[in-house]
Amino acid sequence: SDRCKDLGISIDEENNRRLVVKDGDPLAVRFVKANRRG
């Protein structure tokens, strides 16, 4: 059975890249931190 996967990338106010992977359930979410200058 082939299911549709929704890929979405959003940037929050802290310039962190948020990669959201939804496969039927919104539980599969990965957070990727962007490189921050310190």
From Swiss-Prot:
InterPro entries: Kunitz_inhibitor_STI-like_sf. Keywords: Disulfide bond, Protease inhibitor, Serine protease inhibitor. It comes from Neltuma juliflora. This is Kunitz-type trypsin inhibitor beta chain. Coiled coil: none annotated. Belongs to the protease inhibitor I3 (leguminous Kunitz-type inhibitor) family. Heterodimer of an alpha and a beta chain linked by a disulfide bond. It comes from the Eukaryota. The keyword Nucleus does not apply. Inhibition of trypsin. The keyword Disulfide bond applies. GO terms for molecular function: serine-type endopeptidase inhibitor activity. Gene3D superfamilies: 2.80.10.50.
